[in-house]
């Protein structure tokens, strides 16, 4: 699954908008100031694939090109057309180059899902449900399929929630040696090297009587059927002394009721693998674990882990938010490594420490191996995360008077260093210094090249020069070339820009051109020989 190109007529602040993703992307990172529309772009893609999967009328007009299962797919959607059959037009180019137009019904109802990704994952690190709400129809369909006892319930659109980090961790412990691939770090090695997790000590499931009823199914578990019923039966067989208890539960509104609860205790990896033995792969096992949450029977999961150098086991809830965040994203990538999937991640790095931020894309590649079949589109405001990327992996979204535009960086972030990344077009900062220090530098430079300093200004200059020298800055007035450059610079610089935190691309280019012009003048004047 690879996105190629997207044009949007009008969605929120994206009007006459276009973005090209390149030819062979695994990851595409969106940069831009707040309000440029990065999250809106992710939201638009979720809506597009939601509607394509459901065979629904388009919510807005767009043109989308992407590759899926060796097919090149071209979708033209116009929500203003009166006839429903004309609103979405699709052309498919086969591997042999033959191009065929197909109907929307054939496209969305194809039982083999030849033209759509197996999964579209969404993740948003903030508290808003702006992204989550677009997954409601698919989650409800998945929920209803489970209640009906469908053996393979459908769920192509998947919104990642924090509770699923626990399921991802449990699925990591089930990986076998046969599943290891070239270029991909083993699950056990990943847990040990990155998180210091030596082993799984125990897992304690608490499940409660659901709000739904069922006539047929396993009578032990409220007549649960399908994926949920099978999983509860496997859990029951593997657990040490399963317990059924009645417990009074208080609702959010303050009312109380008595519900039946099951308690299942698994003694580490051996018991967990007894449950896993009934599933073909980690993906199916993860789906079974998640069925307890989707079906509203999960009360809690307590996972105890042994960490390197720790005397006492720790619980999953004691892990940091950054660890839980990383487990979920990498787990989903890992479990769908052989599937055609699209990951739409809105700032998935918010809780990562600097060391993990620098390695973020290495972690991703270790999760999927050498031949990724997915496309990860993510937003970030973290310069460390993009420090290893080539320019082709990055898109800068910029807001101008006529709309939002997307550009490729002029240089590779890789090799620039964090300070240069921050002051380049990638983030546009005027300086990486704190503002009080930068203001001291600006004022000291003004005084340095002043032809006539008053006595108070002379005292101010000496004070600032000493303060900056103590901080490690070389700002003396004995450097003739430096002073000549600063004098020309201050004479031409827009003084208002000194109070700007972020510069526009146009302002950055103007300053670069001014700097080049000044250097040419200094060379012509004989300052360089």
Summary of predicted features, one role per range:
Residues 56-149:
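Nucleotide-state sensing region of NTPase/ATPase domains
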Residues 22, 170-324, 330-342, 523-528:
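Extended helical coiled-coil dimerization/tether regions that scaffold
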Residues 36, 105, 130, 155, ...:
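Residue-level detector of alpha-helix boundaries and kinks
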Residues 11, 24, 69, 95, ...:
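Generic structural motif
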Residues 259-269, 274-276, 347-364, 374-410, ...:
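Contiguous hydrophobic segments
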Residues 1-65, 69-72, 277-288, 293-432:
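Switch/communication elements of ASCE P-loop NTPase nucleotide-binding domains
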Residues 1-6, 99-101, 529:
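N-terminal intrinsically disordered, low-complexity tails enriched in polar/charged
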Residues 1, 111-121, 127-221, 399-404, ...:
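Acidic, Mg2+-coordinating catalytic modules of nucleic-acid enzymes
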